[in-house]
Amino acid sequence: MTTRRTFRWPSLLTESGRGIAFGGDYNPDQWPEETLDEDIRLMVQAGVNTVALAIFSWDKIEPREGEFTFEWLDHVIDKLGAASIAVDLASATATAPLWLYERHPEVLPIDRYGHVVNAGSRQSWQPTSPVFKEYALRLCRRLAE
């Protein structure tokens, strides 16, 4: 990421006197960029003060193996911050990118009948996969930088 934030969640809520976090998951990477300002306006109107962000965003953060792009995420975080909406940044590992499944099909889960479950839904990976763990940790480290 290009910008360091000066606050730590949840101190933003308690220090501002706004109390409990109110909001939900926000997935702006799944919608056209033009909806961002309207989404934020409606969040402010509804009293939203916190969103969980980047839950399903691995493929947007790392569109190709080893190529990371955080500009869009920085932009969204900055816009939310300007509206006093705190961000609970997710690990972005709920859904892995297609390139990971194509290179490492062994990360796909196997159902109770021994059938490989295809990619395309949330958490369609084996939690015990050392390959998945390696890639997920790399992503999380980059997010933390």
Language model feature labels by segment:
Residues S16, M43, P127, A144-E145:
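Structural motif
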Residues S11, D37-R112, R141-A144:
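Aromatic-lined substrate-binding rim segments of carbohydrate-active enzymes
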